[in-house]
Amino acid sequence: MDKVCAVFGGSRGIGRAVARLMAQRGYRLAIVARNLEGARAAAGDLGGDHLALSCDVAKEHDVQNTFEEIEKNLGRVNFLVNAAGINRDNLLVRTNTEDMLSQLHTNLLGSMLTCRAALKTMIKQQRGSIVNVGSVVGLKGNSGQSVYSASKGGLVGFSRALAKEVAKKKIRVNVVAPGFIHTDMTKDLNEELLKKNIPLGRFGDALDVAQAAVFLLESPYVTGHVLVVDGGLQLTM
């Protein structure tokens, strides 16, 4: 049976690194991003017969159409990675409601919608694996990231509850929780200052997180787990 993996947020950063590893392992990939050109570029870099799609994960209709296109072109999805995410860092008293909702909708609701759509086919197959990309601040919290922390903390609770719901269907759900990783989201941070708080003394790379995500995707006896990939940052928070 074909191994079909949908990677939301697959056009850059962690999602793109996951897609690269999965392609090397023989998976057929659907690279999904808001920006279709970015998705096409990422899919093209992989070589082979991979699919590029545009989707706003916070819109139910978009998500449903995306899964229909994947099934029509690649087959039923049996692996799902939710790496789409945004941040709008600010103190809560300075955060407007629009920025609150955009983070909650993309980071939490979006993963709920993609998981629900994927489960419809995974349950029929009686197998499947889902990895949601969280964050260490969803576990520890961080000043100036209260809303982002809430969205990622909510993702952990959601993933653990979902893991319980679908375990009897042979479907696994896990979370990878990165710390400071070299991506577009961290490019403006003061790395020299921040890495002093990281026991391993450096920011991670997208590949560091991707390797952990692939481990969770393929480990048949791991579910409901949160794998922190942060160079030891949580030890100091």
Swiss-Prot record:
Pathway: Lipid metabolism; fatty acid biosynthesis
Keyword terms: Acetylation, Fatty acid biosynthesis, Fatty acid metabolism, Lipid biosynthesis, Lipid metabolism, Mitochondrion, NAD, NADP, Oxidoreductase
Keyword Cell membrane part of the UniProt annotation: no
Sites bearing N-acetylmethionine, chain numbering: 1
Matching Pfam families: adh_short_C2
Positions of NADP(+) binding: 11-14, 34-35, 56, 83-85, 148, 152, 181-183
Modified residues (N6-acetyllysine): 195
GO molecular function, one term: quinone binding
Chief location of this protein within or outside the cell: mitochondrion
Cellular component GO terms, alphabetical: mitochondrial matrix; oxidoreductase complex
Record SMART domains: PKS_KR
EC number annotated for this UniProt entry: 1.1.1.100, 1.6.5.10
Catalytic residues in the record: 148
Subunit relationships: Homotetramer (in vitro). Heterotetramer with HSD17B8; contains two molecules each of HSD17B8 and CBR4. Does not form homotetramers when HSD17B8 is coexpressed, only heterotetramers (in vitro).
Role of this protein: Component of the heterotetramer complex KAR (3-ketoacyl-[acyl carrier protein] reductase or 3-ketoacyl-[ACP] reductase) that forms part of the mitochondrial fatty acid synthase (mtFAS). Beta-subunit of the KAR heterotetramer complex, responsible for the 3-ketoacyl-ACP reductase activity of the mtFAS, reduces 3-oxoacyl-[ACP] to (3R)-hydroxyacyl-[ACP] in a NADPH-dependent manner with no chain length preference, thereby participating in mitochondrial fatty acid biosynthesis.
Name of the protein in its database record: 3-oxoacyl-[acyl-carrier-protein] reductase
Organism: Bos taurus
Source species taxonomy: Eukaryota, Metazoa, Chordata, Craniata, Vertebrata
Name of the gene: CBR4
